[in-house]
Amino acid sequence: MPIPCPHFKITIVKRSQGQSAVAGAAYQSGERLFSEYDQKTKFYNKKKELVHAEIMLPSHAPPGYADRATLWNAVEAVENQWNSQLARRIVLAFPVEVPKKQYLSMIKEFCQEQFVSKGMIADFAIHDKGDGNPHAHILLTLRAMDEHGKWLPKARKVYDLDENGERIQLPSGNWKCHKENTVDWNDQKYAEVWRHSW
């Protein structure tokens, strides 16, 4: 018998809306984290409902990113625009049919298969207040890293070419070009893939 699809919400942490990846990580983990960006300590007491919090790294990520403050301060440092997108946030409910003892293995398997294996860092926390709404928060990095653990650009400039393979010059003297994402993680199709996989 199929399990009904539980709550699954995806949002982007945006600096333009006054949001912070460090604050998001502090909220879900219950840790006290200092934000180098705004020089403020972020703390939201979630100890009563926190079951487990963990950071899962791809093999090429710097080991230091297993520290929550180091990771999210590094993310905020590389995103230097006022309107930067800092992280992807997913909040998902555990199906009521799943025993509590399976929550950790279930969320780790989901994060590994859907995110970490693709190069994202996944910072997750399982919350359970005992009110019948056990759920997990996942913060994901938006930038890929090279094999040395250096953040890569989110997009690159690509010059448009004519039928002869030559760059097209505009009347302004500039070359016609467009931006291409360096990873396809923002493609809308993944929202459905992730929901279906959960």
What is each residue range found by the language model?
Residues 1-197:
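N-terminal nicking endonuclease/strand-transfer module with a His-rich metal-binding environment
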